Regions:
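Low-complexity, intrinsically disordered segments enriched in Ser/Thr together with acidic residues
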Residues: 96-115
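A surface/secretory-pathway sequence property marking extracellular, secreted
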Residues: 64-88, 136-139, 148-152
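Extracytoplasmic/periplasmic copper-protein system
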Residues: 2-4, 33, 37-39, 126-153
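Extracellular adhesion/glycan-binding regions together with long Ser/Thr-
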Residues: 84-99
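Bacterial N-terminal signal peptides that target proteins for export
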Residues: 2-12
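Short, solvent-exposed loop/turn segments enriched in Ser/Thr/Gly
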Residues: 40-45, 102-103, 116-119
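Low-complexity, serine/threonine/proline/glycine-rich extracellular segments that form mucin-like
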Residues: 35-73
Length: 153
């Protein structure tokens, strides 16, 4: 009977660790910080890249701000120069090694209407690219390359 009591906690701990290892890739997605902004106000959001494209360094990030966002500006960061053309902010000219975390900041005036808004991002690397443009449908599993979501309140 004593053996059973020790096996159950050990099995639970093993299952927890396995679950964390399986979930770990979800942390590698590009995310917005803060993820929530007030409608109709000026805000600055960092879109954080945590890795390259299959170990290749990031050389460019193209952030496609949705319609309704105005006064869009990119903030130069760590060797990257930000340029804005319409709704698109492009960070280029630098190299971000794989496994290095960096926030690429965009300032804007948020639209008035509340809701969840996906922000599509194209990550270009020395070898290849990753399109963070997939939108998660209600009740569906998270896609492989989800677009970060901003919540407008």
């Amino acid at each position: 009977m004593t053996r059973f009591r020790f096996r159950l906690p050990a099995a639970a701990a093993t299952a927890t660790v396995a679950g964390l290892l399986i979930a770990a890739p979800a942390f590698a997605h590009i995310h917005a910080d803060p993820a929530e902004v007030q409608g109709g106000t000026e805000a600055t959001v960092g879109f954080t890249v945590e890795h390259g494209c299959k170990t290749s360094p990031t050389t460019e990030l193209e952030i496609q701000m949705p319609d309704g966002f105005t006064a869009i500006k990119g903030i130069d960061v760590a060797g990257f120069t930000a340029t804005v053309k319409g709704q698109v902010v492009t960070f280029a000219g630098g190299t971000l090694p794989d496994g290095t975390e960096q926030a690429f900041q965009v300032s804007f005036t948020a639209p008035d209407e509340p809701g969840e808004v996906p922000v599509k991002i194209i990550q270009t690397c020395e070898e290849g690219s990753t399109n963070w443009i997939e939108v998660q449908a209600d009740g569906q599993a998270e896609p492989e390359h989800p677009a970060p979501v901003l919540t407008i309140t």
